[in-house]
């Protein structure tokens, strides 16, 4: 029985790796091709008292290049304007944060024709004012393929996380993998730290407390990682978790909550601040599931996706000891991807994108009640 169970786990991991690599190759090919398939996706949503800010990408141009975008909406979510990052070739934003006088967006872009032909990107951080004008933009390239996944603003600058690896067969560089970069307010690099290898590793999300930075991601295709850093970048600890992938982290009442996946099940963990697991919960009601994002509002809310012929979104509410309170799936269209969630005026606002029968990808807003009832969908 143990041998059979171990074999099933290995098969599940192999299937997951194949799916992930397949998605990456499709993504790269999709935006290099000149097909007329339309793509418009939202990867992150932020809100202040007056506006909603969504970042992502679309390919609404003659050459069908993917272009990083910032979209600004009023309180009724009517779009006021949208700005594309029209530098280089393909680009995308994956994370954002709001400041008193503007927005910071982070992602990646192909700067040169050589980058474009090699399918490699540079990390990108851009500061916008509230009118959508660029205040500064700065690139980061440790190894030949780099992207930023999230950003947090602090008084003296910005913390940014992501990945920098060799896409080619190059070896020999001890740096690379997941990256943590500290910028000043003008977009200059103060310092950076890397963890992993020159071929693997990524930081997907982080949480900033008063004195420490908690970062989650993966070292390779099936090893999740939790790191605790001082604010100056000194590594306090690195904890590795086999057969796991970590996508998001939140800190509540001196406990860390991390979501992601384990084999073919979505995963939620409760840990001490020293990185020791207290309890875990596996969401296996649907096949090939993963959690992408976690937030807190009296309870834990996680969003993610599952795959069984088509991709469906999932949203689950948990108590603080990881007892499941309610769960729903979202599958109105052929494929549905939920990418981010915020608490908004007593409800939950979820963003993402869907693939329709005509093969076009369109972004959407989905508003849920606290009881996880769909109140409205806006495309």
Which residues fall in each region the model found?
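Helix-centric, low-specificity signal for extended rod-like, repetitive segments
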Residues: 1-2, 14, 115, 360
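N-terminal Sec-pathway targeting helices
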Residues: 2-21
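A sequence-level/structural motif corresponding to short, flexible coil/turn segments enriched
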Residues: 21, 25-379
